[in-house]
Structures are given as C-alpha cells and as structure tokens.
Amino acid sequence: MARLKRKDILGLRDMTVEEIDLILDTAEALKDLATRPIKKVPTLRGKALATLFYEPSTRTAKSFELAGKYLGADVITISASTSSVQKGETLKDTARNLEAMGIDAVVLRHSMGGAPHLLARALRASVINAGDGLHEHPTQGLLDMLTIRQRKGRFKGLKVAIIGDSYHSRVARSDIFALTKYGAEVWLAGPSTLLARGFEEWGVRTTTRVEEALEGADVVIVLRLQLERQQKGLFPTVAEYHRFWGVTPERLRLARPDALLMHPGPLNRGVEISTAVADGPQSAILEQVTNGVAVRMALLYLLLGGGEAA
C-alpha cells in the first residue's frame, strides 16, 4: 500500500491527484467493512482519536466517530459547549492538553478559517479539517468525489452544476478544488449575492440562472441555504429563493436523464431542494453519507495505520 506523504488533512487545494486517488482507492477497499455483521478490525488498535467540534454537526462528527471505532481506535468526542472552552481555554491549549493525554489525531471543526492549520503547526498529532469557516471541508469534498467516481466512473468532461449558496459554502470550495484537478466542467448558480467569487482561474463558470447551469449537467450538487452565516438582504425571502433557485423536478429535467443528484446535508426541504428531488431516483444523498464513513476510515488508516507520513 502506498503511503500518504503528509501528517495532516487540511484542504484539497494543495492535494495532488495521486493523493486523492490513493484516498479514494483506500476508501473503496474499506467501504464494505461498514456492512459486515461485525463492523470491527484491529487496524488502529492502540491509537486514540479526538473529535473537537466548535460548530454543530451530525454527519461529519458521527461518521468520524464510527470510522475510528470500526478500525479499532479509541475515540473521544468533545463539544465546545461542554468543554473548558466555556471557561476561556484557547483552541491551542485544548488541543495541546489532548495531545498530552496521548491523542494521535484531532478532528477539528471551527468557525474560524485556518484554525486546523494553526493546530497542525502546534501539534505532533495529525490534524484533520472537518470544516473551517468559509475555507474548506476536505472530507466532504473527498466523499463527493468517491460518490461521483463510483456512479460515473470518471471526472474528466463531466458537467457539474453546484446550485445554491456557494459564497458561504466550504463544501463548494473543496469540491471545486478537487473536480477541476480532474478536468470536470464546474458551474456555480444562485443569487448574485450568494455566488462564490474568485474561481475564474480554476475555470469555473458562474450564472444567476439555475436553468443554464442545469442544462445537460451530469452531476448536480445542491447546497444548503446557510442562514446562520448570512446577513439580511442577500435574497428576498425563503419562498422567493425556492421559486427562483430551488431544485425542483421540473428544473432537474434540464440535466441529463442519468444525472446524479447530491447534497452535503442537512437538507432544507422546500427551500434549496424539493422533497420529490431529494427522495427521487437520481438522488445519491444517502450514498454520500455511507461514503463519508468509508472516506474517513481511509484517512485515519492512511494517517495512523497504513500510511505514515514520510
């Protein structure tokens, strides 16, 4: 097994195609573990993982917890709301104390962009970015890549329409960085106030017309309307948003008949996506969740078990 020649997973912008391929290949090899009657192997026995979340999470936090446990690691879950952070302890001090307890890897989600990079420089332990501010969400990007590869068999030449609030979406950024490395044609669509900026150099096309992005799309990635990160006035109302930019069955028919429908979750049904689309035959949303466990198992294996940093 080839080695992952890095200590930390901080983003996909600087990750090579070879590294991404290694992670996806490893995830595919480990994926069936989650479906076995006994979901446990001793690969990471004796290793300790801490998940440290300063923002709410269900899928990412719990899939990392399961990934570690399936591989035999000891896993502790720390929520900022119930930790010494409430007493004024800094992020760096919290992580250093965890390392002093023998933690081998820290999974961090934080509202501040660059927080995982700060920890990576301060710790000997591996740091995995589980989402930092408006920066990146690399493990979501990797599980999206795995889902597309398994369903489509390729990336090059695919038209991928990313619909919704890309401005506030770290998922969109990681998806863009990964997909464009493989030659996919990426479109962003949504209100002009919610479109990510500065991706022209990556070959990304933007439009305020959802229909233009969906026309002939092979993959449709719908993004959540992140009201908690927004200022007022970025769009009229939630109802108006759904009317003009929501992905409905009628709009999805503009994509290719075999188009893949994805969403990083959590869903706002009736806002960015209709229930008929979310639960329809083209939806791979639950498959993404399954692949999330596999990708996170692969990263833990490569960082702590079979892929020691060079």
UniProtKB/Swiss-Prot annotation:
Please give the InterPro entries that the UniProt record associates with this protein.
Asp/Orn_carbamoyltranf_P-bd, Asp/Orn_carbamoylTrfase, Asp/Orn_carbamoylTrfase_sf, Asp_carbamoyltransf, Asp_carbamoyltransf_Asp/Orn-bd
An example GO BP is: amino acid metabolic process
UniProt entry tagged with the keyword Transferase: yes
Pathway field: Pyrimidine metabolism; UMP biosynthesis via de novo pathway; (S)-dihydroorotate from bicarbonate: step 2/3
Q: Which Gene3D superfamilies match?
A: Aspartate/ornithine carbamoyltransferase
Please name one Pfam family that this protein belongs to.
OTCace
- Keyword tags: Pyrimidine biosynthesis, Transferase
Name this protein carries in UniProt = Aspartate carbamoyltransferase catalytic subunit
| Species of the source | Symbiobacterium thermophilum (strain DSM 24528 / JCM 14929 / IAM 14863 / T)
